[in-house]
Amino acid sequence: MAMVLMFTTCPDQEVAERLADGALTAGLAACILKTPVDSLYDWQGKRAAEGEVVALFKTSVAKADDLEKWLAENHPYEVPAIIRIGARANESYADWLAEVLEA
């Protein structure tokens, strides 16, 4: 079954937890993975190196637009990276995902 993986970077674990909890509570994601990363990027003409937390949201195709909008509205970054990837899950996981998101 088709599903969507959507990820964003957060400034810290607290923000990642807040976004994860909010998405779960709103029924927009069935599961969120969080992991610390080191990010290197250019911002406003300067090179930046920051510790961040990647939050990977697992959701349905039907909920993806709403999740993306919700993340954009609730993210603390001025320009958050909210990246959507189409994916395919094994049948039992896809059934669980659908059940959770329909509840």
Task: List the model feature ranges, each with a label.
Residues M1-A103:
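Positively charged, small/polar-rich N-terminal and surface patches that mediate targeting and assembly
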